[in-house]
Amino acid sequence: MNVKYRESITRINDKEKEVKSKNILELKEVNNMLHIEKINGKNVWEILKLHVSESQKEFVAANDVSIIEAYATITASGFAFPFGIYDNKTPVGFMMIGYDSADYWEDAPDIARGNYSLWRLMIDENYQKKGFGREAVALGLDFIKSFPCGKSEYCWLSYEPENEVARQLYRSYGFIETGDMVSGEIIAVLKL
């Protein structure tokens, strides 16, 4: 393990304790109607209709691309969990969780091996600024902490350097930037 990576992990462990108690209190005040549902033949079309604003398209792949990536990953014996994000029965966003990197991702960062990732998160432009993104991260982390692919030490994600909204959202959950990049995006890690 290189020194820079080890230092990042130490910062993650320290920050995690500080953030956990804050987020537990805040989540108790959030509307509990938001939930996630696995993408299936019944809901895929309504999820494909969701999109971010024109100015946000550089920050997140379209849902059709994400669902194709999930399919390609799963058929290559990898792990991808695509979900619709719902407020009651209304679709408001999309999330995808990944695990490991196996043979299907040639240029995977070291942190991907044996760890979970919050691979995609988007909230439709019509449902933003309502706290859904923040609550969706909590739902995603709850799913990850059920360890559907087995135990893991970390959850990681990446975002464009210009995406300050994502940076602040993930930082509020204790994700710490490692200083590493993948495909031009900043990698941030959370100890589970």
List the predicted regions and their residue ranges.
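Terminal substrate-recognition subdomain of acyl/acetyltransferases
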Residues: 12, 27, 176, 181-192
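Conserved active-site alpha-helix within GNAT-family acetyltransferase domains
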Residues: 134, 161-179
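Conserved beta-strand-loop-alpha-helix junction that forms the acyl-donor binding cleft
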Residues: 151-167, 183-186
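Acetyl-CoA-dependent GNAT
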Residues: 34, 38-119, 124-126, 143, ...
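Conserved N-terminal entry element of GNAT/NAT acetyltransferase domains
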Residues: 9, 16-45, 49-50, 192
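Active-site acidic-Proline motif in GNAT/NAT acetyltransferases
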Residues: 124-126, 130, 161-162
